[in-house]
Amino acid sequence: KRKTAVYVKEGTKTKLITDNMTGKVTEINVNLINLLLNNKYLPVICPPALSEENEIINTDNDWACAVMVGALKIQKMISLFEASGLLKKFGDESSLIKNVDKNKLDEYFIYTQGRMKKKLLGAKEAFAQGLKQLYWSDGRIKNPIIKALKGEGTIIS
C-alpha cells in the first residue's frame, strides 16, 4: 500500500515528504511464487512492488520478507547485506553477535542504528509470522549462503 507521506530526517531536521513512491507490503502473490517454484524456477524477489493503484513503489525489504514468511510458511531464511551480521558496535566487524534468542530481540535495539533497526523490526515480525531461524550474513563475500549456514554471521533462533 502506497504511503501518502513519509518523514525524513536530514541532520537535525525532520521533513515531511508528500510526493514519495514508497509503501508497505500487505500481501504476497503466493500463487505466482508457487507456480515458479513448482516449475523449478527460483524467484528473486526485490523491494519494488505494485501499489493497489498498480504504481511501482519502493518497499522495505525486511518487512516484505516478514510478510512472505507468513504467506509461504517459511521456516528458515537467509538475509545477506553489507555487514557480517548484527554488530555490537557499528562498523566494528570484530563485535559480531553470533547468536540471538528470537524471544529477546528487543534487547538488541541498543546495538542498532539506521537500516539495522528496520532489519530488527522485520525480524521480529518474521518470527511473529512463524519463522524458526534467521541467518544474517555478509553478501559481499565469496560463497555467502554457505558461510551463513556455517554460522559465519548472526543466527537468530
Report each predicted region and the residues it spans.
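C-terminal catalytic "cap/lid" subdomain
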Residues: 1-157
